[in-house]
Amino acid sequence: MSTDSSQFEVVPANASALDNDVSSHMSMLYQDIVRNPELFWEMLRDFHESSDKKFKIPIVGGKSLDLHRLFNEVTSRGGLEKVIKDRRCKEVIDAFNFKTTITNSAFVLRKSYLKMLFEFEHLYYFQAPLSTFWEKEKALKLLIEKSANRDKDSQELKPGTVITGIIDGKFESGYLISTKVGSEKLKGMLYHISPETKRGKKKAKSSQGDSHKPPKRQRTGYNFFVAEQSVRIKAENAGQKVSSPKNFGNMWTNLSESDRKVYYEKSREDGKRYKMEILQYRSLMESRVAEIVAATDAGTSASAAETADEASQENLAKTDACTSASSAAETEDEVSQ
């Protein structure tokens, strides 16, 4: 019996139709997942269990992260890779309206998505076979690394860099300003430094002491031991230039426990000193901020018209000055190495 060759020609047509049916089914399934939270959770749990992965909902801000919401927010913007490329992570974060401040929230959500949803996205959103997931995962890692380097470069501003900012208020010595660096919003103070101020700076510092600097951190018993040994070595070699030995660690190790107790006690006393001074320092800083805010409010109410006129001219103006920030904690070396 002869066979009509046309019988063989319907196979690719049927295969193509089958592919279309599968694609259409997966597309409908994704829409169902987006609309139906219960279906989403059921499928996500089954997906992880079938892959022998631990199914544990991340905790963010003290609450369980809504993975369904996260999946919808990311895929509605084209998937995780596109969100990172288009720098839209903040949009996703803002959609959650976290009541508490989440440290490095972009990293936390991205990590949660990678662990719980990225492979799920690959299968149900992009409708791609799991056999190709490793390629997408590798590409995303390179993108994240590139994005991190780009953000780092964009935020490393050198002294003298011109930035655009907004003047929020005015006080006796300068302005309260805000600016945006990358995706981060910053607030600070812009000071007028007159020649008289510069000349009197040294004198003022001697009269005020180091009240504007944070106190030195608590020293350890080992710190006290090294300081004592350095003094002893310099005294024994008076008149000679002697560098401190680098084997203080061995000397400390060879001390008996009873000998170390002397230095531990000094460290405890220094801890009391630090706690007292840090409280005083914080109180001083809070008072200074309150004074600046009060002066700003008073100046604004006294000369509202003048301030509004100046602000309208200077808002969004490019400045070539450096903003003053709170003093960073300074730790001085106890011993010259």
UniProtKB/Swiss-Prot annotation:
The keyword Transcription applies. It is found in: Nucleus. Keywords: DNA-binding, Nucleus, Transcription, Transcription regulation. Residues 319-329 have a biased composition (Low complexity). It comes from the Eukaryota. GO terms for molecular function: DNA binding; DNA-binding transcription factor activity. Residues 215-282 bind DNA. The keyword Protein biosynthesis does not apply. InterPro entries: ARID_dom (IPR001606), ARID_dom_sf (IPR036431), ARID_HMGB9-like (IPR045303), HMG_box_dom (IPR009071), HMG_box_dom_sf (IPR036910). Residues 34-125 form the ARID domain. Residues 197-221, 298-337 are annotated as: Disordered. GO terms for cellular component: nucleus. Its main location: nucleus. It holds the Pfam family HMG_box. PANTHER family: HIGH MOBILITY GROUP B PROTEIN 10-RELATED, HIGH MOBILITY GROUP B PROTEIN 9. Binds preferentially DNA with A/T-rich content. Belongs to the HMGB family. This is Putative high mobility group B protein 11. It comes from Arabidopsis thaliana (Mouse-ear cress).
